[in-house]
Amino acid sequence: MKIYLVGGAVRDQLLGLPVKDRDWIVVGADPATLLSLGYQQVGKDFPVFLNPKTKEEYALARTERKSSTGYTGFICDFSPTITLEQDLIRRDLTINAMAQSEDGEIIDPYGGKQDLENRILRHISPAFSEDPLRVLRVARFAARYHSLGFKIASETLALMAELAQSGELQHLTAERVWLETEKALNEKNPEIYFETLHKTGALSVLFSEIDALHGVPNPVKHHPEVDSFIHTMLVLKQAVNLTENNPILNKSAVRFAAICHDLGKALTPQNILPHHYGHEQAGIKPTRSLCKRLKVPSYFQELAELTCEFHTHIHKAFELRAETVITLFNRFDVWRKSQRFQEFLQVCLADTRGRTGFENKDYPQIDYINQLLHAANEVDVQQVIADGFEKQAIKNELTKRRILAVKQTKTNYPTN
């Protein structure tokens, strides 16, 4: 029996990156052997065992043979005769198909180390096409390692495009698509994930609402980048910058809202382009459709829909009447969900800066709207009750006093 460290741990170690998870492969053993050594079996589909001391995962070496459509349609062989090389070749990319022996030797039968040095994401064999999930995984790796200069090999991109056209992607479950997408949203360059999926044709299959933004123009005065998809990717990049070092915000939810904020522009009638009157309200339906299909968590969906509807309110914050401001606060339920409103404001800032040449633009609207929020929050509901108001009258009086507080703050707010 031999044990090897495999996959991401070896890859990241060679890249000089911190190793998060360590996966191990056991060659020349069967389940009974590991159980006798105190390992605990946790996998039903695949024999995976927890080390009794470290609790790290150890899997028996295996081969896979395609038996039906989708990413689950495989027949696996876990016999003790399976070699390390046979196990490694079933993996997706050469950089993920390296192993390290217990004495520290790197086993690299498929050129992963060379591809690491050359910053190439390359598939190992034509068997890559047997698992449609790999299209998303490779796009996610491209997002993760883009800042290190990694590119996808042209032949791998071609295979990904073939998979996108084959109909295999439709067999992926919503949960798997969302899991990969949420992971991608947390990478350093999530825009590369979506750009890669567009390049391969997978975006139109899995994220048609986002893909529909391609080629939709904006007024060049406000959007020098013109194209709505390009703008959305720039907004996503800005959202990454704004959330990267902010542990309070739900960064993947903010980034998802950034992607959805202008989905309504794809529905703008041709005769009024490049203007997009009413795109805010129009964006709710495609956002809801996307979220329902991919079973996106409700928190993400709520933030994305609210962002679609109200992002231009913040752009025009200085023009809003006090009554409109309180209506906005009520819609976001800022009284109980203050963090969600702050996440929304970050998307609005990302939207302003996600335009060519506007990357460092000041956005005083956030300070202004937060001052109005502070004023509204200072209104004491207990005082309203103490003043003798009851039932529905409490709510009406509370709203009235909040509007008055906002009006006073607006009057006193410095205009320059």
Curated annotation (Swiss-Prot):
Molecular function in Gene Ontology: ATP binding; CCA tRNA nucleotidyltransferase activity; cyclic-nucleotide phosphodiesterase activity; magnesium ion binding; phosphatase activity; tRNA binding
Cofactor note: Magnesium is required for nucleotidyltransferase activity.
Chain positions recorded as Mg(2+) binding sites: 21, 23
Keyword line: ATP-binding, Hydrolase, Magnesium, Metal-binding, Multifunctional enzyme, Nickel, Nucleotide-binding, Nucleotidyltransferase, RNA repair, RNA-binding, Transferase, tRNA processing
Record: residues binding CTP: 8, 11, 91, 137, 140
Residues bound to ATP: 8, 11, 91, 137, 140
GO biological-process terms attached to the record: RNA repair; tRNA 3'-terminal CCA addition
UniProt cofactor(s): Mg(2+); Ni(2+)
Catalytic activity, EC: 2.7.7.72, 3.1.3.-, 3.1.4.-
Catalytic function, reaction form: a tRNA precursor + 2 CTP + ATP = a tRNA with a 3' CCA end + 3 diphosphate; a tRNA with a 3' CCA end + 2 CTP + ATP = a tRNA with a 3' CCACCA end + 3 diphosphate
SUPFAM superfamilies attached to this UniProt entry: Nucleotidyltransferase, Poly A polymerase C-terminal region-like
Domain notes: Comprises two domains: an N-terminal domain containing the nucleotidyltransferase activity and a C-terminal HD domain associated with both phosphodiesterase and phosphatase activities.
Other observations noted: A single active site specifically recognizes both ATP and CTP and is responsible for their addition.
PANTHER family with a match to the protein in the record: MULTIFUNCTIONAL CCA PROTEIN (PTHR47545:SF1)
Function of the molecule: Catalyzes the addition and repair of the essential 3'-terminal CCA sequence in tRNAs without using a nucleic acid template. Adds these three nucleotides in the order of C, C, and A to the tRNA nucleotide-73, using CTP and ATP as substrates and producing inorganic pyrophosphate. tRNA 3'-terminal CCA addition is required both for tRNA processing and repair. Also involved in tRNA surveillance by mediating tandem CCA addition to generate a CCACCA at the 3' terminus of unstable tRNAs. While stable tRNAs receive only 3'-terminal CCA, unstable tRNAs are marked with CCACCA and rapidly degraded.
Protein name: Multifunctional CCA protein
Biological source species: Haemophilus influenzae (strain PittGG)
